[in-house]
Amino acid sequence: MRNKLFGHVLFFISVLFWGTHCFASDMKIDIRDVKTSAGIGYWYKQKEGLPLVSMTMAFKNAGFIYDPVDKKGLALLATSLISRGTTKDGESIAKLFQEKGIIFHVSVDSDNAYVTLKTLSENLDFALGLIGEVLVDSPIDEEVFVIEKERQKSDIRRDSSDPGQLAHNMLNKVVFGDQPHAYDASGTLDALEGVTIEDVENYRRENFDLDKLVIGVVGNASEEDVSRMLDKALARLGRGQNSKVIGDAVLNIGLRGYVAYDSPQSVIVFAAKSIPRKDPKYHVAEVLSSALGGMGLSSVLMQELREKLGITYNVRSGLYNVEGASLFQGILFTDKTTARKGVEAFLRTVQSVKEKGLDKRALEIARAKLVSSTLFSLSRTSSMSQVLVYLQLHGFSADIHNYSARYESVTLEEVNEFAKNFLGDFTIVEVGAENNIDATITS
């Protein structure tokens, strides 16, 4: 797993790119906000038909930006290890899941740790029982620990020669400096070397906190059965032990960075200040961002830089939000001979939208994409459980039927007025054979 510009090993990357936080107004989806007898809350959607259940759990404030400064990479290593543990009888948990055809995964992003599960309804109790062991005390073999640590080190070494990852890391370094928001999921070789099995166990004890747990359940199982199984499986998890917080980041915007890399291509990344998800205008920012660089060939940036100027095969942009930091980011791939021209065209296009606004066609395509793309996600049991967790994490209510109206109601006047204040200065980083952007910060 590697910490990519728009991914950050994001568990929800497909959800976010599909626009699954908006909902078609003609879909009738009954979401129940349930509390078990033990006080475990979850959102539940019963889906009859196939005997399948999908469940997603998120443990807040367990992501890699919360890694101790001298243990960077711990969260990623810990979440990759705990699913490879054994039962108290010494049986491989991964093998037990596999034998029953259960899909199970533990992952981490910048903010949170996640557990995903997809199983036949008849195996749900069994699967949750094993998850309860995984989250509390399933033994981790020393040999497996060494193998996983070496694998993560290998990823770090590989990333050191990947131009996209180099660009991302340098952008984080310039924008965030030494703040936790600059951490990479894999950590550093030096920090990872000092991580022990005891650190992994401490991570498990501290971060799998019932008070930080968010759950989404979709499938063919009764609410009563799901509640009973959750109470039994998670009975040994603690409450209140995770007290970690991350403050607001100080953003360094308007700077230029450069990483020398011998290649005929340049990778150029951009970052500007954005707004947090809780901002009442966030949905307007989503529409604007989608129109600018989130619609593939239909986006404003692709039309200008690829179709008209022919200086890139791919340019895109999007909103990036983590705890304490909100950015509008972009990435441009171009030949080293057109890198300067590409940056100038990118900034000129953004400035044009800032001053003149979007046209009606761009707005309509962006709104339609945000509204209609959710249909695909909501038609799938597994992705829908992720959507339910995403909504809870970001403060939405269980009544999802009015969400698409937020996007449909955005007018051309509103988005263009918003663009005047939203689009500002950029920090820019280039990775390539030549410093085409007059960068003063180099690596």
Describe these PLM feature segments.
Residues 1-7:
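Positively charged n-region of N-terminal signal peptides that target proteins for export
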